[in-house]
């Protein structure tokens, strides 16, 4: 099969189109003929810096995929040849990823592709959907009626997070830049929109929320993470996707008694946590129902 192979860490030219043997399947695995693969910032970071398993090079990147089941083992119970699936699996240095004609996945970690999405749309959804879902519902303790700050609301994770928060009955303030992104997040249901290039988001959020958001979701990191501590209520939640720098000043978080959580949806893959990967597949099934009901969309 054809695959885009990462031969070393470096610039884009380390990605080379090569012929690889067709993968075999065992246990409850599916062989999926990929129709589309997602491209995310994590893919470019792994390509530039190296994968989580540098000893297993060369590697096939790509976490997200959507396609048709080409073959299934006799032990597979949920899918058969011809079924359309989507998933987030592999591509971080251990299990081969989705930058290939075929991918192998344990059927327990896959979900039926939402009928309302094209294969390209479905392949763009798993990582951002799981990330936003876990960040809000599992790390951030999201409750109906809360006021939630979501940074970079027009981004991949951000635009899904806005919709999930609104579906759960929360009010949303989000940061963006420019007219086009403002229109997008308004259309997604954001209640408060702050152009961070023209206004101080800390002051804007404190004014909108009456003293601080109940929950803040940081998808940017750095100085934004630091400043966000100043617009969360006492005993509120701050969830971040990024690792804070060594120069982070935690004083405000401590004084406000914030609960700071980290969201990395790759953890189950990194450590082989089967139950957690099955849970993520359930998130894809629940998200798929929202897509098909017209309550959630991927941009």
What are these regions (language model features)?
Residues 74-75, 174-184, 223-224, 244-247:
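Short glycine/proline-centered loop/turn elements that form peptide/ligand docking sites
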Residues 223-296:
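Glycine-rich phosphate-binding loop and adjacent beta-alpha segment
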Residues 200-210:
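Short amphipathic alpha-helix with an adjacent loop that forms part of the alpha/beta core around
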């Amino acid at each position: 099969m054809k695959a885009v192979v990462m031969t070393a860490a470096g610039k884009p030219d380390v990605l080379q189109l090569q012929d690889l043997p067709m993968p075999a399947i065992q246990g409850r695995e599916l062989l999926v003929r990929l129709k589309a693969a997602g491209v995310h910032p994590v893919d470019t970071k792994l390509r530039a810096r190296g994968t989580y398993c540098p000893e297993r090079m060369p590697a096939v990147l790509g976490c997200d995929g959507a396609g048709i089941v080409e073959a299934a083992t006799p032990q597979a119970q949920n899918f058969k040849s011809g079924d359309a699936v989507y998933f987030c699996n592999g591509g971080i240095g251990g299990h081969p990823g989705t930058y290939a004609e075929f991918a192998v996945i344990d059927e327990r970690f896959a979900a039926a592709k939402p009928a309302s999405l094209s294969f390209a749309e479905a392949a763009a959804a798993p990582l951002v959907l799981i990330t936003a879902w876990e960040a809000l519902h599992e790390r951030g303790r999201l409750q109906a009626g809360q006021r939630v700050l979501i940074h970079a609301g027009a981004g991949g994770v951000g635009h899904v997070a806005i919709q999930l928060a609104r579906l759960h009955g929360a009010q949303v303030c989000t940061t963006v830049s420019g007219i086009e992104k403002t229109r997008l997040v308004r259309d997604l249901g954001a209640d408060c929109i702050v152009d961070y290039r023209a206004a101080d988001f800390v002051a804007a959020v404190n004014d909108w929320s009456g003293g601080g958001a109940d929950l803040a979701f940081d998808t940017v990191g750095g100085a934004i993470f630091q400043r966000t501590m100043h617009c969360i209520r006492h005993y509120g939640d701050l969830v971040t996707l990024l690792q804070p720098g060594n120069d982070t000043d935690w004083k405000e978080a401590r004084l406000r008694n914030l609960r700071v959580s980290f969201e990395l949806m790759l953890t189950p893959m990194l450590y082989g946590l089967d139950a957690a990967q099955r849970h993520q597949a359930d998130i894809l099934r629940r998200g798929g129902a929202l897509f098909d009901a017209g309550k959630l969309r991927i941009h």
